[in-house]
């Protein structure tokens, strides 16, 4: 209430920001005459002048107006597009570190040019993040002529580039890259064994396109780099055959809820569709154990170490069957099970669900079950982008999430007014009792509109729903196109024609499509259809000029029919996704219309609003099969969406609290790695670490004599090197420490002399980094297990996040100690063979996958170099189940132990 009163009195924060930019806008407009008189050659000279001013101590604010004026004129000359005043305002907001909300077709891409150019002048680099490779490449090529004229370099990072090319692209003044590639490059850089192989430079300023998609929709799914592990893939096939033997608990027929008392649960498991969780009852666990034993899958108790994983396998199998549906969450293609992005409807090529879920789905669908992966490095987008000195973003729909942007990222949203008034008519929702009645009504409405000639875009939430509607349209003789994950290769063609007369398009989620639907169709696409692609640029431009008259005729005809009619076949969980669908109509002042058709059987209604709406519809006198349209119902739907959005916000906030623990630890580990990569005297670092560890052990002793703990640790570290010291139990502890340090120094000096200082330093660096990486990977797995364990402590009235922080700190302290001790032990106990005079460069390769959890996949090769040192073992033999000495990450018996 207070917020509403304040906004009426002094205006919203967004409106106040807009007013603050007006004086600067007026000054930029006045400077246009100066820019018009410049020759093309003058632009790069002016850029150098601005850079010199910054070097002499001036601020970005002091050169802002000239920089914006130059970039505006450069766009006019190279793109034949002069940025509107609203686009200049958007650029100012981006420079100030705000999120701009601009409607579809208002020119977000061009708005970013001014802010990117200004901030690139510091020489620290600007990164522009997009949601896919296509948009990164398109936007960089589109804006390159502008940046070239201004004399600043522009690059693009694509998924198929190697690290050398990536490094060159990141070194440019302005770099376009996807959020996934940027995140994986950060993780990969912190797994390198050579400083020269790092591709990124220090994070400075970042502009995020479709910022709501990246920082909100994808915030629940961390990026993960993973490697293969020895998993029991056959177990997923075994438990898949048991799904039908287990029964879900009965629900109350009126409320649709399970009984509150545990004793009243009559089945084996419960299903939480909202949280996508399966929970076994005590009875269910007993039945599962009996099934596993009777089928010969296990012998003995299910609760032994070797058998307990079957509870996890069975849980994932039930999830796969009950919560993850074909043609909704995934499709089965030539590559097996492929995940469909719930927000964009695109296939997420190469990605896999984590934690065995993908294997469970593969078993369900009867395709080859691949091995599980282990986490090697991970980060969330939230913490990735919080590392930048300044971030800003662009989207067509951010205002609904303004609270979250401010609370999590300290980013304010500025709603930029449209250049022309919005002419689209947004109708109230039409609501039906059943999905069947709803689909029939949509088909009738589309048929009427199709016959009239008005283009229609029908948005669906899944492939399954798009195919149902497609079949119904076909039976009515409605010619149409379907855009979903199964035929995404035709996306450009389908979108180009979606605004033409009589066009009917069914699309699964239009979020992040990145292409405007133009009334009358796309003129460039029309020309390409007529003259083909094998023509010169001049011939193409001439053909476009000749086609313009016919195109304008078609444009005006479609405009007179009412423009693009957008029909939503279902409300999405997020209002933003609905607004993005609506936003495809009414671009740049064009007419348009939108309406959502909803049924009480839709997922959103069933899970979050069903009972309330049923009651309200009864009061409004609605009969089964009859539609009803009322502002109260639309408000009720929006309130249901708000509840889901609030719930999802809490999930993202919760994830961030846990990830903040990992972030502090990851930052420490990565700082250690960087320090070691730069260190030219790692021998001294190891000796210091040894002395600190021996001191730590002695501090725990109660007398001047050595303790058993001290003796055990010393024997583990020094092994054969203690020969000749006699009985060390009787030596004074301080004297023993001094002798041990002498032995260690002599040991390392001898090895250094045998192969040379530089080569030895490289060997030590490799060993130190290898130990850091392998131990940190184990640590990440331990944190995963800890997180699951503390979740259950909430039942004992304990705060899970507090427990996680406290215990996470303890195991991290152990990790730091383990890294040092295992490194010291290894470098001391290995003898280097100095007989080989030719130490060639060796590459340490690992197969690792880049994963977006719950998604995963994309196999990449990490090459980690270190000079070749022949190693001869003369200390205790490696156990068959210990990690192999080569650093492959495999057990010794499965690697060099085979031979």
From Swiss-Prot:
<keyword id="KW-0813">Transport</keyword>
<keyword id="KW-0547">Nucleotide-binding</keyword>
<dbReference type="InterPro" id="IPR014018">
    <property type="entry name" value="SecA_motor_DEAD"/>
</dbReference>
<feature type="binding site">
    <location>
        <position position="884"/>
    </location>
    <ligand>
        <name>Zn(2+)</name>
    </ligand>
</feature>
<dbReference type="Pfam" id="PF01043">
    <property type="entry name" value="SecA_PP_bind"/>
</dbReference>
<dbReference type="Pfam" id="PF07517">
    <property type="entry name" value="SecA_DEAD"/>
</dbReference>
<dbReference type="InterPro" id="IPR036266">
    <property type="entry name" value="SecA_Wing/Scaffold_sf"/>
</dbReference>
<keyword id="KW-0997">Cell inner membrane</keyword>
<dbReference type="GO" id="GO:0031522">
    <property type="term" value="C:cell envelope Sec protein transport complex"/>
</dbReference>
<dbReference type="GO" id="GO:0043952">
    <property type="term" value="P:protein transport by the Sec complex"/>
</dbReference>
<keyword id="KW-1003">Cell membrane</keyword>
<dbReference type="GO" id="GO:0008564">
    <property type="term" value="F:protein-exporting ATPase activity"/>
</dbReference>
<keyword id="KW-0472">Membrane</keyword>
<dbReference type="InterPro" id="IPR011115">
    <property type="entry name" value="SecA_DEAD"/>
</dbReference>
<dbReference type="InterPro" id="IPR036670">
    <property type="entry name" value="SecA_X-link_sf"/>
</dbReference>
<dbReference type="GO" id="GO:0005886">
    <property type="term" value="C:plasma membrane"/>
</dbReference>
<dbReference type="InterPro" id="IPR014001">
    <property type="entry name" value="Helicase_ATP-bd"/>
</dbReference>
<dbReference type="InterPro" id="IPR027417">
    <property type="entry name" value="P-loop_NTPase"/>
</dbReference>
<keyword id="KW-0067">ATP-binding</keyword>
<dbReference type="InterPro" id="IPR020937">
    <property type="entry name" value="SecA_CS"/>
</dbReference>
<dbReference type="GO" id="GO:0006605">
    <property type="term" value="P:protein targeting"/>
</dbReference>
<dbReference type="InterPro" id="IPR011130">
    <property type="entry name" value="SecA_preprotein_X-link_dom"/>
</dbReference>
<dbReference type="GO" id="GO:0017038">
    <property type="term" value="P:protein import"/>
</dbReference>
<keyword id="KW-1278">Translocase</keyword>
<dbReference type="InterPro" id="IPR001650">
    <property type="entry name" value="Helicase_C-like"/>
</dbReference>
<protein>
    <recommendedName>
        <fullName>Protein translocase subunit SecA</fullName>
        <ecNumber>7.4.2.8</ecNumber>
    </recommendedName>
</protein>
<dbReference type="GO" id="GO:0065002">
    <property type="term" value="P:intracellular protein transmembrane transport"/>
</dbReference>
<dbReference type="InterPro" id="IPR000185">
    <property type="entry name" value="SecA"/>
</dbReference>
<feature type="binding site">
    <location>
        <position position="896"/>
    </location>
    <ligand>
        <name>Zn(2+)</name>
    </ligand>
</feature>
<keyword id="KW-0963">Cytoplasm</keyword>
<feature type="binding site">
    <location>
        <position position="895"/>
    </location>
    <ligand>
        <name>Zn(2+)</name>
    </ligand>
</feature>
<dbReference type="InterPro" id="IPR011116">
    <property type="entry name" value="SecA_Wing/Scaffold"/>
</dbReference>
<dbReference type="Pfam" id="PF21090">
    <property type="entry name" value="P-loop_SecA"/>
</dbReference>
<keyword id="KW-0811">Translocation</keyword>
<keyword id="KW-0479">Metal-binding</keyword>
<feature type="binding site">
    <location>
        <position position="516"/>
    </location>
    <ligand>
        <name>ATP</name>
    </ligand>
</feature>
<comment type="subunit">
    <text>Monomer and homodimer. Part of the essential Sec protein translocation apparatus which comprises SecA, SecYEG and auxiliary proteins SecDF. Other proteins may also be involved.</text>
</comment>
<comment type="similarity">
    <text>Belongs to the SecA family.</text>
</comment>
<dbReference type="Pfam" id="PF07516">
    <property type="entry name" value="SecA_SW"/>
</dbReference>
<keyword id="KW-0653">Protein transport</keyword>
<dbReference type="InterPro" id="IPR004027">
    <property type="entry name" value="SEC_C_motif"/>
</dbReference>
<dbReference type="GO" id="GO:0005829">
    <property type="term" value="C:cytosol"/>
</dbReference>
């Amino acid at each position: 209430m207070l917020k509403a009163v304040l906004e009426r009195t002094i205006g919203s924060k967004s409106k106040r920001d807009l007013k603050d930019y007006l004086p600067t806008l007026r000054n930029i407009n006045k400077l246009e005459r100066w820019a018009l008189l410049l020759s093309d050659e003058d632009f790069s000279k002016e850029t150098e002048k601005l850079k010199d001013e910054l070097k002499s101590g001036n601020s970005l604010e002091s050169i802002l107006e000239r920089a914006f004026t130059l970039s505006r004129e450069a766009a006019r000359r190279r793109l034949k597009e002069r940025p509107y005043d609203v686009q200049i305002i958007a650029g100012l907001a981006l420079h100030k570190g705000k999120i701009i909300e601009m409607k579809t077709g208002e020119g977000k891409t061009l708005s970013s040019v001014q802010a990117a150019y200004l901030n690139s002048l510091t020489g620290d680099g600007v990164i522009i993040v997009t949601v896919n490779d296509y948009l990164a490449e398109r936007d960089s090529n589109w804006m390159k002529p502008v940046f070239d004229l201004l004399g600043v370099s522009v690059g693009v990072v694509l998924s198929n580039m190697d690290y050398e090319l990536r490094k060159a692209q990141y070194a440019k003044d302005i770099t376009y890259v996807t959020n996934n590639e940027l995140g994986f490059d950060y993780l990969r850089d912190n797994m390198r064994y050579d400083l020269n192989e790092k591709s990124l430079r220090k994070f400075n300023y970042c502009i995020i396109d479709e910022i709501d998609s990246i920082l909100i929709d994808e915030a629940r799914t961390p990026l993960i780099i993973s490697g293969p592990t020895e998993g029991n893939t056959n177990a997923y096939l075994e438990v898949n055959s048991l799904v039908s033997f287990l029964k879900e608990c009965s629900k109350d027929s009126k409320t649709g809820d399970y009984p509150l008392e545990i004793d009243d649960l009559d089945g084996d498991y419960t299903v939480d569709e909202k949280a996508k969780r399966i929970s076994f009852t005590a009875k269910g666990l007993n039945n599962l154990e009996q099934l596993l034993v009777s089928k010969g899958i296990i012998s003995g108790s299910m609760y032994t170490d070797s058998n307990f994983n079957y509870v996890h396998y069975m849980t994932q199998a039930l999830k796969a069957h009950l919560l993850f549906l074909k043609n909704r969450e995934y499709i089965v293609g030539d590559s097996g099970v492929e995940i469909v992005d719930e927000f964009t409807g695109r296939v997420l090529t190469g990605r896999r669900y984590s934690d065995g879920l993908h294997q469970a789905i593969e078993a369900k669908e009867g395709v080859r079950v691949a091995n599980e992966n282990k986490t090697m490095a991970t980060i969330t987008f939230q913490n990735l982008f919080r590392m930048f000195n300044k971030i800003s973003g662009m989207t067509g729909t951010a205002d609904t999430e303004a609270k979250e942007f401010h609370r999590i990222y300290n980013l304010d949203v500025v709603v930029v007014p449209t250049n022309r008034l919005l002419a689209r008519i947004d109708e109230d929702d039409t609501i039906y009792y059943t999905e069947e009645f709803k689909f029939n009504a949509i088909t009738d409405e589309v048929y009427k509109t199709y016959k009239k000639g008005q283009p229609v875009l029908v948005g669906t939430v899944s492939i399954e729903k798009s195919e149902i509607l497609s079949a119904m349209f076909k039976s009515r003789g409605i010619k149409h196109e379907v855009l979903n994950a199964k035929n995404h290769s035709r996306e450009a063609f389908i979108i180009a024609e979606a605004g033409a007369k009589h066009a009917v398009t069914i699309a699964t989620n239009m979020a992040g499509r990145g292409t405007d639907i133009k009334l009358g169709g796309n003129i460039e696409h029309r020309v390409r259809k007529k003259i083909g692609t094998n023509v010169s640029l001049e011939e193409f431009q001439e053909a476009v000029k000749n086609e313009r008259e016919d195109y304008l005729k078609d444009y005006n005809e479609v405009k007179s029919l009412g423009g693009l009619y957008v029909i939503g076949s279902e409300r999405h969980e997020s209002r933003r996704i609905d607004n993005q669908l609506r936003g495809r109509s009414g671009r740049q002042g064009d007419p348009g219309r939108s309406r959502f058709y909803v049924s009480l059987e839709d997922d959103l209604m069933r899970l979050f609003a069903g009972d309330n709406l049923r009651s309200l519809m009864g009061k409004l006198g609605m009969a089964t099969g009859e539609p009803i349209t009322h502002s109260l119902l639309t408000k009720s739907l929006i309130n249901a969406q708000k509840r889901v959005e609030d719930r999802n916000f809490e999930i993202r906030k919760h994830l961030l609290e846990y990830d903040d623990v990992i972030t502090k630890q990851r930052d420490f580990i990565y700082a250690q790695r960087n320090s070691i990569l730069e260190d030219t005297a790692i021998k001294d670092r190891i000796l210091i670490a040894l002395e600190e560890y021996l001191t730590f052990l002695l501090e725990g002793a109660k007398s001047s004599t050595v303790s058993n703990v001290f003796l055990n640790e010393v024997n583990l570290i020094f092994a054969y090197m203690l020969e000749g010291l006699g009985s060390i139990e009787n030596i004074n502890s301080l004297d023993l420490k001094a002798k041990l340090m002498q032995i260690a120094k002599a040991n390392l000096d001898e090895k250094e002399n045998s192969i040379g200082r530089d080569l030895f330093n490289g060997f030590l660096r490799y060993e130190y980094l290898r130990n850091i990486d392998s131990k940190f990977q184990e640590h990440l797995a331990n944190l995963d297990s800890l997180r699951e364990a503390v979740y259950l402590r909430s039942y004992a009235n304990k705060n899970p996040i507090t427990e996680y922080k406290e215990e996470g700190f303890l195991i991290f302290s152990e990790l730091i100690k383990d890294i040092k001790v295992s490194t010291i032990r290894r470098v001391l106990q290995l003898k280097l063979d100095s007989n080989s005079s030719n130490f060639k460069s060796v590459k340490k390769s690992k197969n690792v996958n880049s994963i977006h959890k719950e998604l995963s996949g994309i196999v990449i090769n990490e090459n980690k170099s270190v000079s070749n040192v022949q190693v001869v073992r003369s200390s205790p033999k490696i156990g068959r189940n210990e990690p192999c000495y080569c650093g492959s990450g495999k057990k010794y018996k499965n690697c060099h132990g085979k031979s």
